[in-house]
């Protein structure tokens, strides 16, 4: 079994590669917000062909999602607003 620590970050995506893929049609970045089902997220479909699992985002949220941008929690298929993702996002 692989621990969370060993999962690589998903592919970069979006303007300037500043986002990360969170699902096959979801690209999010701290400064970008989230693109769902748009051209910015097309690259994320490439993850389907890569053998190793990936996980973007630092902080878990909801039931099995990850904080993707300020106030946004993303799952593989969709994103929802999530107040707990506002707090200290990206600050360690």
From Swiss-Prot:
Its main location: secreted. Keywords: Disulfide bond, Secreted. A shorter neurophysin molecule (1-90) also exists and is probably derived from the complete protein by proteolytic degradation (in vivo or after extraction). Disulfide bonds join 10-54, 13-27, 21-44, 28-34, 61-73, 67-85, 74-79. It is found in: Secreted. SMART domains: NH (SM00003). Gene3D superfamilies: Neurohypophysial hormone domain. GO terms for cellular component: extracellular space; secretory granule. One of its GO terms (molecular function) is neurohypophyseal hormone activity. There is an equilibrium between the monomeric and dimeric forms. On peptide binding the dimeric form predominates. Belongs to the vasopressin/oxytocin family. Neurophysin 2 specifically binds vasopressin. This is Neurophysin 2. It comes from Loxodonta africana. The lineage of its organism: Eukaryota, Metazoa, Chordata, Craniata, Vertebrata. The gene is AVP.
